[in-house]
Amino acid sequence: NVRENLTLPLLLDGRNVNKNQLEQLAQILGIQDRMNHLPHQLSGGQQQRVSIGRALITSPALLLADEPTGNLDSKNSAEVMALLRYFHEKKGQTLLVITHDERIACQADRLITVEDGHIAQDEAVRP
């Protein structure tokens, strides 16, 4: 279920689950009412939020997001990017997003374009 999915990284690392932290994360992700649901009972956007939560439960300094909105509609894409921005801005986590979607790329502070395995462009997008 969602609860087990979110806490798996902590358990694999031999760390205790802080129930308050888990509840707060679920609230921020908007999945607090889905904690006992199985993956097939979740929408694509909810599944993506669970994946993000699983990546964030250990409070990493760096979050690597490879195509985080790849299979989502525009509404869910915007919600996922808002969640990632929240954790970047409020929790101070560095976010590295890999995407082919220009709408997602232009939301970055810095944009690095890679072509044929080489950096073709490196620019600040937002101050």
Which residues are covered by each model-predicted region?
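H-loop (His-switch) and adjacent beta-strand-loop-beta switch element
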Residues: L111-E123
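ABC family nucleotide-binding domain
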Residues: V2-Q107, L111-T113
